[in-house]
UniProtKB/Swiss-Prot annotation:
Enzyme Commission numbers on file: 1.6.3.4
Species per Swiss-Prot/TrEMBL record: Mycoplasma genitalium (strain ATCC 33530 / DSM 19775 / NCTC 10195 / G37)
The entry's keywords: FAD, Flavoprotein, NAD, Oxidation, Oxidoreductase, Redox-active center
Cofactor remark: Binds 1 FAD per subunit.
Name of the protein this chain belongs to: NADH oxidase
Active site feature: 11 (proton acceptor), 43 (redox-active)
Length: 478
């Protein structure tokens, strides 16, 4: 019986263990995780804070006992500190007793995920996975200075937003999806909200100005303060009781009773040796093939937030830390270990969506700005259209954008915004088109249906494609 060691038991690790042990009983599995719980859906933190999710326990979909019943040996509060590929063993520290031991493997699965990038009070951006422990409520033990990832963070934020009457103002550092969702949650809890980011626009890494301008307008209309293009210099801390009081920026001090850091994530791979022929990309994630094997290491699989997977849009290895990528990568790795070569994760394109302040947004592939930075000869096509024929009497506005290579007509990216009716699932088939390296001429002739209850003969996707190809007479009059 082969022995598999799994490092990390959140989305990717749980998916791997469930798949492996439901398909085969020929493996012994030892799985280690630093946390005390598994499978927490961090996407629900903002929903729990705002009161949409009533019970945070509902944000778990598995637990250690379930995996044990499947046959896995689960070790919570255990930290893997080193890997030795020659001896095929890992070094593990029991965080409860502080004792260290080694464990042998035939195959190794690295599913250690990613940890929030946090700035300390001296403004040094560091990558220390235990900068604040899983049992700690606050970053660096500074009260009301918090990050956002775990169940423990969710409980702290719920207490801060919904129970602590002294917290009236919230500053959020970072305007990515987590930062924006928490900004909306704070606003729904009647807090004064300031969002700070070095980017020029909120969600600027995922969307171009045609979409971020609209998001910015809605947020400002609702009374949120946006400090874009703003650099954080440090945090204002009351030294007498070690409580955060605000954020120091290059545009002045932002006073706040609670400060949330949502700068982003960095793969938790510091324990992976740099001298054993792993291929890392710039942020420390590890390159893998279509079966999630680490390049150069057939018995080591890397899944989830610490894997660098081939991006079909950029044609580069990229680390895109999404739960969808995590669970798929776990499934593929498990099937390959069992012996299947048919299930492959050949590429990703970063498909994502956001519902915030009444807006429905979705995107995949490259933004216009990123495509230009990568050196593509970029073409764009943007269309504002109604989703149904006007003769239906009721219809909603949709904005759709395609980014493509003018030389080859290859589709590089897409972005979508709707104000009322949600059309975000359209992005799925654009993601597939990018993964399959489709051209505009092919996308424009996809066999789609027409039914006036739902769409137009030339729906907003086809209209955008046709505009890019020069068929402007198909474009709705503005």
């Amino acid at each position: 019986m082969k022995k598999v060691i799994v490092i990390g038991i959140n989305h990717a690790g749980t998916s791997f263990i469930r798949t492996l042990l439901s398909k085969s009983k020929d493996f012994k599995v030892n799985a280690y995780d630093r946390n005390t719980n598994i499978s927490f859906l961090g996407c629900g933190i903002a929903l729990a804070v705002s009161g949409v999710v009533k019970n945070t326990d509902d944000l778990f979909y598995s637990n250690p006992e379930e995996l044990k019943q499947m046959g896995a040996n689960i070790f919570m509060s255990h930290d893997v500190t080193n890997i030795d590929l020659i001896k095929k063993q890992v070094t593990v520290r029991d965080l409860t007793s502080n004792k260290e031991f080694t464990d042998q493997f035939d195959q190794l699965v690295i599913a250690s995920g990613a940890w929030p990038i946090c700035m300390n009070v001296e403004n040094k951006v560091t990558h220390k996975p235990l900068e604040f422990n899983y049992t700690d409520k606050y970053c660096g033990n500074v009260k009301n200075l918090i990050s956002c990832k775990l169940y423990q963070h969710a409980l702290t934020l719920i207490d801060s937003f919904r129970k602590d009457k002294t917290i009236k103002s919230v500053a959020i550092v970072g305007s990515g999806y987590i930062g924006l969702e928490l900004a909306e949650a704070a606003w729904l809890c009647k807090k004064q909200v300031t969002v700070i980011d070095l980017l020029d626009k909120p969600a600027g890494n995922n969307f171009d100005h045609e979409f971020t301008d609209e998001l910015e307008k809605v947020m400002q209309k609702d009374g949120l303060k946006l400090m874009m293009g703003c650099s954080v210099k440090g945090f204002v801390v009351d030294s007498t009781n070690n409580v955060v009081k605000g954020v120091e920026t290059d545009k002045g001090i932002v006073n706040a009773d609670l400060v949330i850091q949502s700068i982003g994530f960095r793969p938790s791979t510091k324990f992976v040796p740099k001298d054993q022929n792993f291929e890392f990309i710039h942020n420390g994630s590890i390159k893998v093939n279509e079966f999630l094997q680490a390049l150069n290491h057939k018995d080591v699989y890397v899944i989830g937030g610490c894997a660098a997977i081939y991006n079909a849009a950029s044609e580069q290895y990229e680390n895109i830390d999404l739960a969808t990528n995590a669970v798929k990568s776990g499934l593929v790795a498990a099937m390959h270990i069992i012996g299947s070569n048919q299930v492959k994760l050949q590429s990703i394109v970063g498909t994502n969506a956001l519902h915030i302040f009444g807006l429905n947004l979705a995107a995949c592939g490259l933004t216009e700005q990123r495509a230009k930075k990568l050196g593509f000869d970029v073409g764009i096509s943007v269309v504002d259209d109604n989703d149904r024929p006007e003769f239906m009497g009721s219809y909603d506005k949709v904005r759709f954008k395609l980014v493509y290579d003018k030389k080859t007509l290859r589709i590089l990216g897409a972005q979508l915004l709707s104000w009322n009716t949600n059309h975000s699932e359209i992005i799925f088939y654009i993601a597939l088109a990018i993964q399959k390296q489709m051209l505009l001429t092919e996308l424009g002739l996809v066999d789609v249906y027409f039914l006036p209850h739902y769409n137009k003969p030339f729906n907003f996707v086809l209209a955008t494609v046709l505009q890019a190809l020069g068929f402007s007479y198909y474009i709705p009059k503005k």
